[in-house]
From Swiss-Prot:
InterPro entries: ArchSynthase1/Queuine_TRR, TGT, TGT-like_sf, tRNA_ribo_trans-like. Pathway: tRNA modification; tRNA-queuosine biosynthesis. The keyword Metal-binding applies. The active site is at 92 (proton acceptor), 265 (nucleophile). Its EC number is 2.4.2.29. Binds 1 zinc ion per subunit. Catalyzes the base-exchange of a guanine (G) residue with the queuine precursor 7-aminomethyl-7-deazaguanine (PreQ1) at position 34 (anticodon wobble position) in tRNAs with GU(N) anticodons (tRNA-Asp, -Asn, -His and -Tyr). Catalysis occurs through a double-displacement mechanism. The nucleophile active site attacks the C1' of nucleotide 34 to detach the guanine base from the RNA, forming a covalent enzyme-RNA intermediate. The proton acceptor active site deprotonates the incoming PreQ1, allowing a nucleophilic attack on the C1' of the ribose to form the product. It is an enzyme of class 2 (transferase). One of its GO terms (cellular component) is cytosol. Belongs to the queuine tRNA-ribosyltransferase family. Substrate binds at residues 92-96, 146, 188, 215. This is Queuine tRNA-ribosyltransferase. It comes from Synechococcus sp. (strain CC9311).
């Protein structure tokens, strides 16, 4: 039911393109995945989302458990029917969000005891409970419950998080009982090479349908993140999709693809859109800026999205300055389209044998007149 086929590789780098087959359709790689935390990609309908080229969409176990609750989603027929999305979906375990909360009472080998920010009640989230919730939600891919250490953290603290993550992965694997849902493990280890090595080898030993690299983009220097990717990917099975969590900038995705990463997710495109910022080439444009007031050209002539096809920079500037919701929606659609087209273009370049020339190393200034 879940199969990953590699269709082409780059002879000069570790880049590869392929297809991850799921019960709700294929996911071509490399692939950027929009984040729909609460069963919605903020400000965008599912029809608009489909027009961006999105294939797989993420939702958040922690947030959906709090509101509306996995029972309501299950009663609707699962997350796909609940939100009206018939393509592949992935749910993260909720671990990152729980560990990001300030009001934690207990983290131990059993799980995490925390206070519900909505009503103050106590919640115990364990590997088994995370699997129960994710199985009820019914996404194509469920992520294992892991402990993501903060940055910076001591070696002892990161080692303890690794030990706990590996033990919890075993419990997740035992508790996960849906054949139509793939379980992905998560590599931790912070910025300590020997711990990343240990975690990669341990998670790979579970022989799961896919593996993610977690604990990146949490405040560490960018070059350290690059080094983690370079170190970890050769230790992961070549015939499984590799997912770098929380990454969504062009340069970081290009560097990661050059080192064998297949999948990405990030809230960045919609967050920027909601703040009036557009991604164009390798730049971020603040559409509030007065320089766009009389600019009646498309936002990006190379982009096929509705914002670029039907509207001008001056109109988008007007919407943002007027605080019209349409402006935020149009910029979110554009930014999503931009990142998805970028990963699609990397895949095509791998097939065409020109990835190393066009994307690795990739710098924004060299791609100002892009054609993707």
């Amino acid at each position: 039911m879940f199969q990953f086929e590699i269709q082409a590789t780059c002879s000069n780098t570790g880049a590869r393109c392929g297809c991850f087959h799921t019960p709700h359709g294929p996911v071509t790689t490399p692939r950027f995945m929009p984040v729909g935390t609460l069963g919605t990609v903020k400000g965008v309908t599912t029809s608009q989302l489909a027009e961006t080229g999105a294939q797989m969409v993420l939702s958040n176990t922690y947030h959906l458990h709090l509101q509306p609750g996995e029972e309501i989603v299950a009663d609707a027929g699962g997350l796909h029917r609940f939100m009206g999305w018939d393509g592949p979906m992935l749910t993260d375990s909720g671990g990152f969000q729980v560990f990001s909360l300030g009001d934690l009472n207990r983290i131990d080998d059993e799980g995490v005891d925390f206070r519900n920010p909505r009503n103050g009640s106590r919640i115990l989230l364990t590997p088994e409970r995370s699997m129960q919730i994710q199985m009820r939600l019914g996404a194509d891919v469920a992520m294992a419950f892991d402990q993501c250490p903060p940055y910076p953290a001591t070696e002892n603290d990161v080692a303890e998080a690794c030990r706990r993550t590996h033990a919890w992965l075993g419990r997740c694997a035992d508790a996960h009982q849906r054949d139509d849902q793939a379980l992905f493990g998560i590599v931790q280890g912070g910025c300590f090479p020997h711990l990343r090595d240990l975690s990669a080898r341990t998670v790979a030993s579970f022989n799961l349908p896919g593996i993610a690299i977690g604990g990146v983009s949490v405040g560490e220097p960018v070059e350290e993140m690059h080094q983690i990717v370079r170190q970890v990917t050769p230790l992961l099975p070549a015939d499984r999709p590799r997912y770098l969590m929380g990454i969504g900038t062009l340069r970081e995705m290009a560097v990661a693809v050059a080192n064998g990463i297949d999948m990405f997710d990030c809230v960045l495109p919609t967050r920027l859109g909601r703040h009036g910022t557009a991604l164009v080439g390798g730049e971020r444009w603040n559409l509030r800026n007065a320089r766009f007031r009389h600019d009646h050209t498309p936002l990006d002539p190379n982009c096929p999205c509705i914002a670029c096809r039907q509207h001008t920079r001056a109109y988008l500037h007007h919407l943002i300055r007027s605080e019209e919701l349409l402006g935020l929606t149009l910029l979110s659609i554009h930014n999503l389209t931009h990142l998805i087209r970028f990963t699609t273009a990397m895949g095509q370049a791998i097939r065409d044998g020109c990835f190393s020339e066009d994307f690795a190393p990739w710098e924004p200034s060299s791609r100002a007149h892009h054609t993707w």
